[in-house]
């Protein structure tokens, strides 16, 4: 496991050296603006802390996504645009088409390509193991590309994966929380959605890396396989840790905290000591046994490894035998 972590660290360091970028360049970044008149908006698709998202149309009538950014530091806007530019051409990743500014409100809007979407929870009982393999494979290909660029998504979850069951099309969207990775750098832990947060975030480990995305995607896979979204549903961060303890055993959480010198309250430790853990096979029931195959459970167990440095990289996950059934079809 130490060798795997060392390889990952070297690879990520090489990526950063090749990119030769500095975070403080964000304030200097400027982007050529397109013509806002070239686009129109119709219905609102969603709203978030940092943006409102609309269905839009381009001049030729084709659909697009219009993401209107709320007023935030210019560095955050610049970073999101820079990341989307670096991701341009990447597989199964939402593509930046244009950047425009409203003349009256001065708001910046990102124009992104359109992707059809059906909530994954509405497809549970129709998904085959091949459907799930294709879904996971495409998201991992997107992450492999992003990580090769030194970019962490930091908010992988079903809501940020556009999926069409008719065509098995997949688009990883919403790179607003994404960040460039620099080995040894401390990052804020208030990223990702609680039910998909890795233990490193919940225990305030700030020097996390791209393996966070692997955990988040593992949570997504667990929800799909066992038809329970979200799979880890804690009421707060401490309860989220306890939900993990119920599955993995409390001692694994405690050992992880001790290894990285992370703080666990006495109350939390006392409760975790009562959890012996469960096997993934114990979640296999009549309704899900056709998709929760031994290969799927093995991939899941590797992605949902408590120690962030022992999780597979996206490339390693893509080489898992689970994908042999679709490897020549994607």
Residue ranges of predicted features:
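Protein kinase glycine-rich loop
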Residues: 42-48, 53
